Amino acid sequence: MENKVDILRVLDGDTVDVLFKFPFGIQVKKRVRLFGINAPETRTRNLEEKRKGILAKERLSELLKEAKMKCILVYHGDGKFGRPLGELFVDGVNINLVLVSEGHSVPY
């Protein structure tokens, strides 16, 4: 299921807060984990992983900054912690795959 979303916040390289927009002016805020990828953690004592996690977060923020109005999230169910899982598209480009292809995340 595709939904138009506004990106509210990038938490790390594979998690974003979004505002889902539904008909009749209904809007819902949710924390979404990007489906099928895993980025290094930003909250860790491992300094190398933290550095890579910060780079992944910055790259995701950069990819989303210019295209907030054209974001589509394809919902893939809920993850093991109850968060929605989704593929994020900006102007038709799959952001999940961009992060993997650039080495900021790995397939999961």
List where the protein language model places each region.
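Small beta-barrel nucleic-acid-binding modules, primarily SNase/OB-fold domains
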Residues: M1-Y108
